[in-house]
């Protein structure tokens, strides 16, 4: 396994962005890659986080046009308060209970984000 602290988490999102599959490759992640050559654009990323070590990634993904979601145990008042604070501060797009069934807020939010990503992609690739 690989230990993942907040610094490693940010490195992993850049690896995903650039299409680097090795968890141990720390050289290529710092190489410049043209936007049109990136495997997963930030604008097509959705980052879920549930703690303080996720805040840097949530902020970065959102800053580069992606979507960040703070999830929390609805029975834990402190976690809920923390997630709602991230939303108020503009660090995440959504703060929602960590429930993922088809009737949940998380399911609805993710479906809406996927539909938005697809619509943005379709608009960018129109040839009129």
Regions found by a protein language model. Give the residues of each.
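C-terminal cap/substrate-recognition subdomain and adjoining C-terminal extension
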Residues: 1-128
